[in-house]
Each structure stands twice: as structure tokens, then as C-alpha cells.
Amino acid sequence: MAASTDMAGLEESFRKFAIHGDPKASGQEMNGKNWAKLCKDCKVADGKSVTGTDVDIVFSKVKGKSARVINYEEFKKALEELATKRFKGKSKEEAFDAICQLVAGKEPANVGVTKAKTGGAVDRLTDTSRYTGSHKERFDESGKGKGIAGRQDILDDSGYVSAYKNAGTYDAKVKK
């Protein structure tokens, strides 16, 4: 069997992949998606001797009939099954040691994960300094919204009759 340091690294990798993508996961059980990711990221599934289909079949073999996840012991059994297929010329123990070294200490890779793109149209639509017309009046210079003051013209109807607006401005218009 593999050395105890390899087993510690193997268990650590199992836990990291088990919680990958699931904030509520405890790290005690791994689902099929994370098992496939582990095999792909750690180069266990090379596409020639071990394919993605093989990975899924082994997962189905080692998990319980109604279970959807595997624990650490089932994980080791699954690695043993894949080891003989991945390293054909070696004995079971040598193949398991080799596959443990592939997996031990690895973490889920986030390369190839798509990022939010900001293209020309997106920049133009979200940059408030480029707004024109009435939309321009809804934001101040810093780009912060003005609230209702930017959406409605607020009239000063402080006159004493409905037709008389802007009280106190008559004296400024009429010179004595």
C-alpha cells in the first residue's frame, strides 16, 4: 500500500474535491460530478486507457444501490479499480501507489472557468457618463442615481392660486 503521507494527502484531496462547488458540503462524501472532476484534474482519466465513461462506471460500481455519493473508503476502492486500468503493466499495489501519487495533494482547478465578459455593448450600456437625453439627468457626476429627483420634474407650486406658480418672483419681474 501507499505510504502514510500519501494517504494523508489522498484524504486531503478527497475532502477538497468533495466540497468543491457546494458550500453546504461537509467533505465526508463526494458526488459523481466531483469524482469526475477529480479524475480529470489529477490526470487519472487520460482519455486513452481511462475515459470519462470508465470513471462514471467505476463510480456507479462502488457506491451503494440507492446512494448518490461515495465516502472515503468507497473512494479508495474506486481508485483501486481505476489503477489497474490506468497502469496496465504494473501489479495492483504498484498501480494503486502510482494513482495515489497522481491524486495526493491536488486541488480542484479553476482554469477554463468562464469569467464575465465586458464587451463594447456592455460598457456602453452600463457607463452612466455616456448616457444621453433624459436618462443623463438620473445620475450625478459620480454615477450614483439621484432617486426620484432624477426621474420626475418637481414643480414649485407654492403660489396662492393654481395658475400662479413660483411665489415671490413677481417683484423680481416688475421693476418699480
UniProtKB/Swiss-Prot annotation:
Gene Ontology CC terms, in alphabetical order: cytoplasm; microtubule
Cytoplasm in keyword set: yes
Subcellular localization, as worded in the UniProt entry: Cytoplasm; Cytoplasm, Cytoskeleton
GO BP field: decidualization; embryo implantation; microtubule bundle formation; microtubule polymerization; positive regulation of protein polymerization
Biased composition (Basic and acidic residues): 134-144
Task performed by this protein: Regulator of microtubule dynamic that has microtubule bundling activity. Required for embryo implantation; possibly by regulating beta-catenin. Also required for decidualization via regulation of beta-catenin.
Residues where N-acetylalanine is found: 2
InterPro entries, sorted: EF-hand-dom_pair, TPP/p25
Stretches for region Disordered: 132-152
Gene: TPPP3
Keywords tagged on the record: Acetylation, Cytoplasm, Cytoskeleton, Microtubule
Tissue expression remark: Expressed in endometrium during the mid-secretory phase (LH + 7) (at protein level).
Chief site of localization: cytoplasm
One Pfam family here: p25-alpha
The protein's name: Tubulin polymerization-promoting protein family member 3
Presence of the UniProt keyword Calcium in the record: no
GO molecular function terms attached to this record: tubulin binding
Family the entry assigns: Belongs to the TPPP family.
Source species of the chain: Homo sapiens (Human)
Listed Gene3D superfamilies: EF-hand
